[in-house]
Amino acid sequence: MSPWPRWHGPAMARLWGLCLLVLGFWRASLACPMSCKCSTTRIWCTEPSPGIVAFPRLEPNSIDPENITEILIANQKRLEIINEDDVEAYVGLKNLTIVDSGLKFVAYKAFLKNGNLRHINFTRNKLTSLSRRHFRHLDLSDLILTGNPFTCSCDIMWLKTLQETKSSPDTQDLYCLNESSKNTPLANLQIPNCGLPSARLAAPNLTVEEGKSVTISCSVGGDPLPTLYWDVGNLVSKHMNETSHTQGSLRITNISSDDSGKQISCVAENLVGEDQDSVNLTVHFAPTITFLESPTSDHHWCIPFTVRGNPKPALQWFYNGAILNESKYICTKIHVTNHTEYHGCLQLDNPTHMNNGDYTLMAKNEYGKDERQISAHFMGRPGVDYETNPNYPEVLYEDWTTPTDIGDTTNKSNEIPSTDVADQTNREHLSVYAVVVIASVVGFCLLVMLLLLKLARHSKFGMKGPASVISNDDDSASPLHHISNGSNTPSSSEGGPDAVIIGMTKIPVIENPQYFGITNSQLKPDTFVQHIKRHNIVLKRELGEGAFGKVFLAECYNLCPEQDKILVAVKTLKDASDNARKDFHREAELLTNLQHEHIVKFYGVCVEGDPLIMVFEYMKHGDLNKFLRAHGPDAVLMAEGNPPTELTQSQMLHIAQQIAAGMVYLASQHFVHRDLATRNCLVGENLLVKIGDFGMSRDVYSTDYYRVGGHTMLPIRWMPPESIMYRKFTTESDVWSLGVVLWEIFTYGKQPWYQLSNNEVIECITQGRVLQRPRTCPQEVYELMLGCWQREPHTRKNIKNIHTLLQNLAKASPVYLDILG
């Protein structure tokens, strides 16, 4: 037998991996300077003998210096200088520590290319002076300088100023040696003629017309005499400056409209610090229509446009050359404003063939005007076959409607655009016949649909063969959907072929084209559903009821080896048809595969007789939404007796990071939740939160769902634009929902967009508006929410990064779990 197979398999893969790791460390060690050790991200030089005399540099063609994030140097008495080019190669450097060494001098530009540097520790060195110019471009979190023999001079007064104005290095006891060689606390240091500079501009605001020129003057003062410079940011217009001691001027010529709203700053800087004064530049210019496109259909018809102008242009629409008087049926909507740019649309509510025609937009302000025209076609005239009669006039430009009210389609006898009365009569008869035929067809289709719904009742799990995995509706323990590579025929209609029971009626759900059926081969090969004896289940009381059946609190015996009995939640199956049983077993297999500390645990099934039973972990405190409301500022309104303790910020962060952990797991298993909300999370002992529900939430939280076409239920307040508009559900759409869950947590369970109707919510979300920051929410968490609510799915934050950020915030704020009593 060939020995070759012995070099394959997991064992050999691990061996090769170990060899590569050892090789990497060996290669790194060869590139290290003497007395130093290196890894791919770290350099440390702590051996005093023989020690180093210069800042450590890596050998060429060895470790990539850009990957080094930390350098530690200690006990190097012969290291005295950091030159300008010593650190420039370490562009990824975050932490620099040089302690108990001989460092005396740091070049001004030593850290010029180290923009990622956050922590510097120069404790117990030989520094006698250190300029703020070393660090002014860095966003440092820590600068530790204790134990250095600083000389009391104006050169170090900036450290005193820093202590007085910033958090770091205020915890340090810094001293300097005075002329008598005595240690003087830096906090008490007084140096004559050594203070902060000042900068003053003539005016805080500046308004100028496009194409003109302007000069901005600035005066500075201070002792030591400051240097004056201008910070113009990304100014587009041509500019030049002149400075002389305490005066400076900035000349801007041929000013561009692109510079409107920008800030220009005059900066004065000396040894002690800096001061600046800023002016806001406003540029006035004539309007231009930069974008006008054919109408698009969403929840309303929209003719999109973009207009630039300052002051804000007045907008006027014309329809077929006549002024269009706006009304509730047709009006201008501005969706996004960016100082001088306005993005919006002419919104039309259910336009007909009567609204077909030419639409002209005119934008006008005191500096000029601009206009553009677009032809719009919404639908053909009823009763006309354009394929057989292509020459028939599609758009009749006479005033069949009055522009003041697009909804008024009353014809006036003297305005009929035809001179042939007989032809007009024939067309009217044709229209009547068409309406009768259409009405008959619609009535027949409705009758067929009712019969199909009557005959095609599905199981409580809302699944049909391999096309569904775990139902999106309330009939399963968790509305999860698995992504796989099987085949399925997607349905794009409002009433998809699948039907699930919500409440007491069958409701069709939309089949999602992005996800396909899972095959048996994709289940884990070791999937084993635990079967529980019926005599081991003792019902205690009813917890609730959904369309699938009832949920009970129960005691289950012999389930865990370490406990004689435990409390569980059992879900019963009311429908005992063959299809329901097949779906029941399939869901049980899938739930068995979902094992995570923040997913409600599925114990197994009981199939001895009827009803069929699923056994789940019991979560003592119920769903998270009720829990949040019961522990919020309004709890006193709902509580009987003493109101519960209000949740703290740290406890809310603890809840949030647990939900994020569960979502990370679901994403790793290629599951999309599609209905993540606090109502679908459960709370147990010691503030333990898990994702999962028992199919009752849509009865209790019916106002959280929006009926589409009278049937389909969608949680639109938790859905991103692509899910609302295109029924597209992905891990990224779950990230959006997670952002809304964070908002729910920090508002103590308020309904998102509670002040708006469902239609208004759809409009807000599709137009790019987001929820406001809750009063109790830290800015870091709100920025995380905004990262979840990016319009483009690929720009949203990664679910793993969200979990890591929440974990770090939660660790920084210890949690006290006595809230549950």
UniProtKB/Swiss-Prot annotation:
Domain Ig-like C2-type residues, every copy: 197-282, 295-365
GO terms of molecular function: ATP binding; brain-derived neurotrophic factor binding; brain-derived neurotrophic factor receptor activity; neurotrophin binding; neurotrophin receptor activity; protease binding; protein homodimerization activity; protein tyrosine kinase activity
Region (Disordered) location: 474-497
LRRNT domain segment(s): 32-61
Residue spans, topological domain Extracellular: 32-429
UniProt xrefs under SUPFAM superfamilies: Immunoglobulin, L domain-like, Protein kinase-like (PK-like)
Reactions catalysed: L-tyrosyl-[protein] + ATP = O-phospho-L-tyrosyl-[protein] + ADP + H(+)
Cytoplasmic topological segments: 454-821
Active site positions, chain numbering: 675
Name of the protein: BDNF/NT-3 growth factors receptor
Species of the source: Rattus norvegicus (Rat)
